[in-house]
A protein has these predicted regions:
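Accessible peptide chain termini
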Residues: 1, 165-167
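N-terminal G-site helix/loop of the GST-like fold
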Residues: 1-9
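Short, acidic/turn-prone active-site loops that include or flank metal/cofactor-
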Residues: 9-16, 161
Length: 167
């Protein structure tokens, strides 16, 4: 997007947010990340700079909120659940200054084809889903398992660009 930026390694614990509504959960995580980043900036000359925070989570067909998989078995469980079904991906983006903050949440529905045990195992062992919400990256090899999306593709990648632009 051609925007000069600096990454701040904020220390907000996403697991501290206990919420069953995916929209509210995503917002609370982003607000926590933003507060943490702002606290780190408050002691620097960059205090007045705008801060962008974002978070992506997945709402499974069984109505569970998940982020990044904990291990290979968790990845397998998620992919088995997504196989032949539709799930939702939620991302919240927030831009803040010391005076104000603007926030937007985006939902995208993602449908997967039926995946064989072998396909799931091959994908999990490739480690393509490590560190990715829902245990997959639509922009990589997992894209071949997606039959349709309803909403923002960039939301599923991890940053809903149109939502960000419209803030």
């Amino acid at each position: 997007m051609g925007i000069n930026h600096k990454v701040i390694d904020q220390k907000f614990d996403e697991d501290s947010v206990i919420e069953t509504d995916p929209v509210l959960c995503s917002k609370l995580i982003v607000e926590g990340k933003n507060k943490s980043a702002r606290a780190l900036l408050s002691t620097t000359k960059d205090e007045s700079y705008p801060v962008l925070t974002a978070d992506t989570l997945v709402f499974t067909p069984s109505r569970k909120i998940v982020g990044k998989p904990e291990n290979y078995e968790h990845s397998r469980e998620l992919l088995r659940e997504f196989s032949g079904t539709t799930h939702s991906v939620f991302s919240t983006v927030m831009i803040s200054t010391t005076e104000q903050s603007l926030l937007k949440t985006c939902e995208t529905k993602v449908s997967f084809k039926n995946m064989s045990k072998e396909e799931i195992e091959e994908y999990v062992l490739s480690e393509e889903g490590v560190g990715k919400a829902g245990a997959y990256g639509i922009h990589g090899p997992a894209g071949k398992y997606v039959t349709s999306i309803e909403g923002s593709y960039t939301n599923v990648v991890g940053l809903p660009v149109l939502s960000l632009i419209h803030i």
